[in-house]
Amino acid sequence: MEGETVAYKFEILKGQDNLFYWRFRASNGEVMCSSDGYTAKASAKNAIESIQSNAPRAMIEDKI
Protein backbone atom coordinates (compact mmCIF):
# COMPACT_ATOMS: atom_id res chain seq x y z
CA MET A 1 0.00 0.00 0.00
CA GLU A 2 2.99 2.28 -0.03
CA GLY A 3 2.26 5.41 -2.06
CA GLU A 4 -1.43 4.50 -2.22
CA THR A 5 -4.09 6.85 -0.84
CA VAL A 6 -6.61 5.15 1.44
CA ALA A 7 -9.94 6.97 1.46
CA TYR A 8 -11.26 5.61 4.75
CA LYS A 9 -9.52 3.72 7.54
CA PHE A 10 -9.93 2.16 10.95
CA GLU A 11 -7.40 3.02 13.65
CA ILE A 12 -6.79 1.12 16.88
CA LEU A 13 -5.41 3.11 19.82
CA LYS A 14 -4.73 2.60 23.49
CA GLY A 15 -6.21 5.19 25.85
CA GLN A 16 -4.74 6.59 29.04
CA ASP A 17 -7.12 4.22 30.83
CA ASN A 18 -5.22 1.28 29.22
CA LEU A 19 -8.30 0.28 27.19
CA PHE A 20 -8.21 -0.21 23.42
CA TYR A 21 -10.42 1.84 21.14
CA TRP A 22 -11.07 1.95 17.43
CA ARG A 23 -12.09 4.91 15.34
CA PHE A 24 -13.12 5.22 11.72
CA ARG A 25 -11.67 8.14 9.75
CA ALA A 26 -12.75 9.65 6.45
CA SER A 27 -10.21 10.65 3.82
CA ASN A 28 -10.36 14.26 5.09
CA GLY A 29 -9.27 13.07 8.56
CA GLU A 30 -12.69 13.49 10.18
CA VAL A 31 -13.57 10.86 12.80
CA MET A 32 -16.86 9.41 11.62
CA CYS A 33 -17.39 7.03 14.54
CA SER A 34 -15.51 5.50 17.45
CA SER A 35 -15.89 2.68 19.94
CA ASP A 36 -16.23 2.16 23.63
CA GLY A 37 -13.16 0.73 25.34
CA TYR A 38 -12.02 -2.88 25.07
CA THR A 39 -9.74 -4.61 27.58
CA ALA A 40 -7.95 -6.52 24.80
CA LYS A 41 -6.60 -5.23 21.50
CA ALA A 42 -7.87 -8.40 19.83
CA SER A 43 -11.42 -7.50 20.89
CA ALA A 44 -11.17 -4.09 19.24
CA LYS A 45 -9.82 -5.75 16.08
CA ASN A 46 -12.64 -8.32 16.14
CA ALA A 47 -15.20 -5.51 16.36
CA ILE A 48 -13.66 -3.83 13.30
CA GLU A 49 -13.73 -7.11 11.37
CA SER A 50 -17.38 -7.63 12.33
CA ILE A 51 -18.27 -4.15 11.07
CA GLN A 52 -16.38 -4.73 7.81
CA SER A 53 -18.19 -8.02 7.31
CA ASN A 54 -21.72 -7.03 8.37
CA ALA A 55 -22.07 -3.32 7.50
CA PRO A 56 -22.77 -3.85 3.78
CA ARG A 57 -25.95 -5.73 4.75
CA ALA A 58 -27.00 -3.41 7.59
CA MET A 59 -30.37 -1.70 7.33
CA ILE A 60 -30.85 1.99 8.05
CA GLU A 61 -33.46 2.40 10.77
CA ASP A 62 -34.82 5.96 10.94
CA LYS A 63 -36.31 6.47 14.42
CA ILE A 64 -37.41 10.06 13.83
PLM regions and their residue ranges:
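Short arginine-rich
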Residues: S50-E61
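A structural feature that tracks compact, well-ordered secondary-structure segments
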Residues: Y8-Y38, S43-I51
